[in-house]
Every structure is written in structure tokens, then in C-alpha cells.
Regions:
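Low-complexity, disordered terminal segments
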Residues: 1-7
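Intrinsic low-complexity, intrinsically disordered or marginally ordered coil/linker segments
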Residues: 17-214
Length: 214
């Protein structure tokens, strides 16, 4: 009887720990209007929590005030799927400080999937005055938001040049030059197709990512 009682207590403790861990992990995601998180969002939130509490983590202090707002998978063709993680704009500066290291840690947990970070931004259209806004900040225009998304998607790699190629049929292709010094860092060269697929999904614009010597 004593052995069974001990096992029951142990199993209860394990179950209680698992519930507590999931509760704490849920704090790493804040959805708009109290919407329920998806399975993928819960996975990302748990991964962030695990990194934060890991004794070997060198970014645990930075992660304390960081949470996500959403996570989605994007099809990137032959290379499979990428995980796009959205962060509230108010914590984006904190994310940028550790972007490279945090992406690396998350990609260990989402094996064979590239991870891309994006900040939540709101576009104010030309009817912004109807919303009670007198002046539309440039940062809230469609062009500015798409430019910011471009910087987010490739981060922490830096963009060193852009040019637009217009085809005979009028279609546009944005060519993005990335800093050559980042070519061999963070598996960036293998992510060029991922950057293009994610940017297309988020903005509906075609873009090709490359290094200046390509």
C-alpha cells in the first residue's frame, strides 16, 4: 500500500508541475481581445518559457518581459514551412536586442523549420480621419509598414541595398541586398527563399533576397 501511495503522490506532483508549467508558459502569449491561442502558438509560448527558465540560457533576463501575440506557419515550397512569430510592438525593442540568439534557440526546438520574427504594426489607410486621427504618421502608412516588415523578416541580418526591377508586363520584383558579412551567420544563406516566401505572404509583394556578390 505504501509503495502505491508513494507512486500516486509522485504522479500527482508530476501532473501538478506540468499544469503549473503550462500556466506559466501561457503568460508568454497575449492574444487580442482574449482570443484562445492556437496549438502552434502554445508550442511557441512553451518554447519561450523553457528557454527563459533554462539554467544554461544567457538570454533569460531579456526574455522576462517578452511575450508573443501570434504565431503562424508559412509554406516556403521545397524547404517546407517556416514559423512566423508575431510580437507586440511595445516589446519589439527588447526582441531586437536578442533576435539572433532567440531565433537560434527556437529553431532548435522547431527542427527543420526556419523561424522569422515580425512586429505587430497597424496600417492607417487614406480614410484615417474617419477614425478620429488628424494626422497620419508616416510609420503607419502602407509603404512604411511594408518597409519595416522587410527589415523584420531578415533580422538580425542587415539590408545594404534595394532596387526594383519592372518587367515588360508591368510586374515588379524587389531585389534586396543583404550584408555579406552575415552570409555565413545564422544559416542566413539557406534562408533566402524563406525570406521571400514570408515577405510575399505578409505583403503580397514579390521580392528576391541575395548578397551583393550573387
Amino acid at each position: 500500500f505504501g509503495s502505491r501511495h508513494h507512486r500516486a503522490r509522485r504522479d500527482l506532483n508530476i501532473a501538478s508541475f506540468a499544469v503549473a508549467a503550462m500556466f506559466n508558459a501561457r503568460k508568454k502569449i497575449v492574444k487580442e481581445k482574449g482570443a484562445a491561442p492556437t496549438e502552434l502558438e502554445e508550442e511557441v509560448a512553451k518554447a519561450l518559457f523553457d528557454i527563459e527558465v533554462s539554467p544554461s540560457s544567457d538570454i533569460k533576463a531579456d526574455l522576462r518581459d517578452i511575450h508573443i501575440s501570434a504565431a503562424k506557419e508559412v509554406d516556403v515550397g521545397k524547404t517546407g514551412k517556416a514559423v512566423v512569430v508575431y510580437f507586440p510592438f511595445r516589446v519589439w525593442k527588447l526582441v531586437r536586442k536578442i533576435q539572433g540568439r532567440l531565433i537560434r534557440e527556437l529553431e532548435k526546438k522547431f527542427s527543420k523549420k526556419h523561424v522569422v520574427f515580425v512586429a505587430n504594426r497597424t496600417i492607417l489607410d487614406k480614410d484615417f480621419r474617419r477614425r478620429g486621427v488628424k494626422v497620419r504618421p508616416r510609420s503607419r502608412t502602407l509603404t512604411a509598414v511594408h518597409e519595416a516588415i522587410l527589415e523584420d523578416v531578415v533580422g538580425p541580418t542587415e539590408i545594404v541595398g534595394k532596387r526594383t526591377r519592372i518587367s515588360v508586363d508591368g510586374s515588379k520584383l524587389l531585389k534586396i541586398m543583404l550584408d555579406s558579412k552575415d552570409k555565413d551567420k545564422e544559416n542566413v544563406e539557406a534562408k533566402l527563399a524563406t525570406f521571400a516566401a514570408v515577405y510575399k505572404k505578409l505583403t503580397n509583394k514579390e521580392a528576391a533576397f541575395m548578397f551583393p556578390d550573387a
